[in-house]
């Protein structure tokens, strides 16, 4: 099932999205990991949403400011503005009478904290500390010297793996954590190699760690079944 190209508006402009599946019923809003991990997982995410569509569940894959095809410069972004656009997209779905479920991958799970979702499903979610640790490791590997504070505050803009990041954006991740509040269903799935607590661990290799973009159709099938069953339980 081929996705349809669409867009959505927010207070700062307009962003692109891919739309999958039916135009009625609950809808999944999938948020990719940030920065380089987005490139490595996008093909997998598209395959996952296609499989959900085959199971009768609609899906949206939005660009957020500074990512994908967005015209907003990444160096002008904060975590809040990324969350704001996802809230705007969620509100549009709610205005259409459709319940929404967030699917966040890795650091994408840090961006859906404003939206009024009926539930959240997270794959290998990162907290802000883990994200900053990964960014600092990449920054050091590029030949830079210094601790995390030097990376975050040593210049007006820091370049990490081709991404131009501001101190404001980096600081906004310092105490960030995936949304987990009473009253909102949340399911966490992690890889078997990840010892962190989860509702389920699955055997697979981490696509986000590969040097080049990749795919894992078997994992996409497994996770589509998991998400579909979880949404059905939430809707019951």
Where are these regions (language model features)?
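Hydrophobic anchor at the start of a short beta-strand
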Residues: 57-59, 100, 118-120
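Alpha/beta-hydrolase active-site loop
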Residues: 44, 73-97
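A domain-start/cap signature at the N-terminus of enzymes
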Residues: 1-6
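Glycine-rich nucleophile elbow surrounding the catalytic serine of serine-hydrolase chemistry
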Residues: 94-116
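The alpha/beta-hydrolase serine catalytic core
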Residues: 116-236
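Short, surface-exposed "cap/lid" segments of acyl-processing enzymes
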Residues: 11-15, 19-63
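Cap/lid segment of the alpha/beta-hydrolase catalytic domain
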Residues: 40, 65-77
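Structural motif
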Residues: 33-34, 101-108, 123-127
């Amino acid at each position: 099932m081929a996705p349809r190209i669409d867009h959505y508006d927010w207070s700062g402009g307009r962003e692109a999205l891919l739309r999958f599946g039916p135009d009625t019923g609950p809808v999944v809003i999938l948020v990719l990991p940030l920065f380089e991990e987005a490139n490595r997982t996008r093909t997998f995410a598209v395959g996952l949403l296609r499989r959900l569509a085959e199971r009768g569940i609609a899906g949206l894959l939005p660009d957020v400011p500074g990512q994908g095809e967005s015209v907003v410069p990444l160096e002008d972004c904060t975590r809040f503005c990324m969350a704001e656009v996802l809230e705007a997209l969620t509100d549009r779905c709610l205005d259409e009478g459709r319940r929404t479920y967030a699917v966040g991958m890795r650091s994408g799970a840090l961006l859906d904290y404003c939206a009024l979702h009926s539930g959240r499903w997270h794959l290998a979610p990162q907290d802000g500390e883990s994200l900053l640790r990964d960014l600092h490791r990449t920054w050091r590997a590029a030949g830079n010297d210094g601790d995390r504070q030097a990376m975050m505050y040593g210049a007006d803009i820091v370049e990490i793996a081709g991404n131009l990041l501001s101190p404001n954006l980096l600081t906004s991740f310092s105490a960030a954590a995936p949304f987990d509040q009473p009253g909102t269903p949340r399911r966490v799935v992690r890889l078997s190699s990840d010892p962190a607590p989860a509702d389920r661990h699955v055997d697979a290799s981490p696509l986000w760690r590969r040097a080049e973009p990749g795919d894992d159709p078997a994992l996409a099938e497994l996770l589509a079944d998991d998400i579909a069953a979880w949404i059905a339980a939430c809707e019951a």
